[in-house]
């Protein structure tokens, strides 16, 4: 069961860029709650608190119960904007989530057992194609990460999402089988193989 974190906010009477700038000058972060066929609710959050939560990690895969002046909203963050210079939050979007609903989230991929991949042990390099994957999950059971097992992979092999064991009730949110990583040959081996291929082509042309 995913832990639901509590967050306090106050309602904003006005939306728009001017009102948002005023909130930031007052040391707060403007935000909005939307979805579930209800009217959007414009809110503001404590700057220090939301900054700490964002930088603690897993922000976009965490369920929150936001108390807006005594009214509670069950939500998941959908997006946030950071100041391009200061890297401090400027705005946050929250999506309402009903009990039992499923959500699509980006979940980090952790690559394990590199020491058990012959291709890496022989000098190959792990080329990570996807650091995260889009998954359809029950809102109450969002995984912190998924594990990609590199055991047995040789140079030239690829690891796909279909080889990853997903938790119960969790599935890929995209069509097709995402490539997560490949084992690529070291540069010296690539050059040697290219030379061999060129020599073979030249010999075939003379034959």
Curated annotation (Swiss-Prot):
Q: Does the keyword Ribosomal protein apply?
A: yes
The superkingdom listed in its UniProt entry is: Bacteria
Q: Which keywords belong to this entry?
A: Ribonucleoprotein, Ribosomal protein, RNA-binding, rRNA-binding
Q: Which GO terms describe its molecular function?
A: 5S rRNA binding; structural constituent of ribosome
**For this chain's UniProt record, which GO biological process terms are given?**
translation
- The residues forming a coiled coil are none
Among InterPro entries, the record links this protein to: Rbsml_bL25/Gln-tRNA_synth_N (IPR020056), Ribosomal_bL25/Gln-tRNA_synth (IPR011035), Ribosomal_bL25_b-dom (IPR020057), Ribosomal_bL25_C (IPR037121), Ribosomal_bL25_long (IPR001021), Ribosomal_L25_dom (IPR029751), Ribosomal_uL5_bac-type (IPR020930)
Taken from the UniProt entry, a GO cellular component term is: cytosolic large ribosomal subunit
Asked if the keyword Disulfide bond belongs to this entry, the reply reads: no
> Record's PANTHER family?
RIBOSOMAL PROTEIN L25/GLN-TRNA SYNTHETASE, ANTI-CODON-BINDING DOMAIN-CONTAINING PROTEIN (PTHR33284), RIBOSOMAL PROTEIN L25_GLN-TRNA SYNTHETASE, ANTI-CODON-BINDING DOMAIN-CONTAINING PROTEIN (PTHR33284:SF1)
Q: How does it assemble?
A: Part of the 50S ribosomal subunit; part of the 5S rRNA/L5/L18/L25 subcomplex. Contacts the 5S rRNA. Binds to the 5S rRNA independently of L5 and L18.
Q: Which family does it belong to?
A: Belongs to the bacterial ribosomal protein bL25 family. CTC subfamily.
The job of this chain, per UniProt, is described as: This is one of the proteins that binds to the 5S RNA in the ribosome where it forms part of the central protuberance.
What is the protein name stated in its UniProt record?
Answer: Large ribosomal subunit protein bL25
């Amino acid at each position: 069961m995913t832990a639901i974190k509590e967050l306090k906010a106050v309602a904003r009477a006005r939306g728009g860029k001017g009102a948002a700038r005023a909130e930031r000058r007052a040391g707060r972060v403007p935000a909005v709650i939307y979805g579930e066929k209800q009217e959007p609710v414009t809110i503001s959050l404590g700057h220090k608190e939301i900054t700490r939560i964002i930088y603690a990690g897993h922000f976009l895969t965490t369920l929150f119960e936001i108390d807006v002046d005594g009214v509670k909203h069950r939500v998941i963050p959908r997006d946030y904007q950071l100041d391009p210079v200061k890297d401090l939050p400027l705005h946050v979007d929250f999506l309402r989530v009903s009990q039992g609903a499923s959500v699509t989230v980006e979940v980090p991929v952790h690559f394990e057992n590199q020491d058990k991949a012959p291709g890496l042990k022989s000098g190959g390099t792990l080329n990570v194609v996807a650091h995260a994957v889009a998954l359809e999950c029950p809102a109450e059971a969002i995984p912190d990460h998924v594990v990609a097992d590199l055991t047995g992979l040789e140079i030239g092999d690829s690891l796909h999402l279909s080889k990853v064991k997903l938790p119960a009730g969790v599935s890929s949110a995209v069509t097709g089988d995402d490539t997560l990583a490949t084992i690529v040959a070291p540069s010296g081996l690539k050059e040697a193989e290219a030379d061999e291929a060129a020599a073979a082509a030249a010999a075939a042309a003379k034959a």
